[in-house]
A protein has these predicted regions:
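Jelly-roll (double-stranded beta-helix
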Residues: 1-204
């Protein structure tokens, strides 16, 4: 789950995979939080972390400026709210794109909605640098809901299927949803972001 190596304009990329337990009526984890560094728990104890959350896992209000965040939800639920007044509850297959620009405060929490079963949560988050002239553009928030995102199916030589969800740019002639108005112009013409599902042993 540690950040991956990136190159400009990508500032940061991290993969979160947490096998959260059943939730309570307040969407907090069932059981004790003893042994965790509450407020900064990245322990992966029992297969999951609280991160900066104190009752509900996740990342309470914190600031960003001068770059963009792209959050790709693979499994579970994410609750977003920010200083622009935007809120969203999104999950499996949805993508959130936020341009921090001149500054925004937001939170990303992982509510444990299911009381009768576990609440596994998986997501990728990418930070995308803005060029100097766009560092202080107006903040912007948008959602790419799962049904609006192109998915390309790819078969290998043994007819095993991979799927490519096109989040930004293009893949195999299919385009991603329209990006925010002030996204990095250095990024989109030359690169793409895709979420790819590959079966174990498959070639892509």
């Amino acid at each position: 789950q540690m950040p991956w190596h990136t190159v400009d304009p990508f500032l940061f990329c991290v993969h979160h995979l947490d096998d959260y337990p059943k939730g309570t009526a307040n969407m907090t984890p069932v059981g004790s939080l003893q042994g965790r560094n509450i407020g900064s728990d990245f322990s992966n104890k029992d297969g999951w972390s609280m991160y900066h959350g104190r009752t509900v896992p996740g990342f309470p209000r914190h600031p960003h400026r001068g770059f963009e965040t792209i959050t790709i939800a693979r499994q579970g639920i994410i609750d977003h709210s920010d200083s622009m007044g935007a809120t969203a509850r999104f999950g499996s297959g949805d993508v959130q794109w936020m341009t921090a620009g001149k500054g925004v405060v937001h939170s990303e929490m992982f509510p444990l909605r299911h009381q009768e079963k576990k609440n596994p949560t998986e997501l990728f988050q990418i930070w995308l640098n803005l060029p100097r002239e766009d560092k202080f553009v107006e903040p912007y928030f948008t959602m790419f809901w799962r049904d609006s995102i192109s998915v390309v199916e790819v078969l290998d030589e043994q007819d095993r299927l991979s799927t490519v969800q096109v989040v930004a740019g293009q893949f195999d002639g299919r385009s991603a949803p329209a990006p925010p108005p002030n996204c990095s112009p250095r990024f989109l013409p030359t690169a793409s972001i895709s979420s790819i599902k590959i079966i174990h042993g498959e070639f892509f």
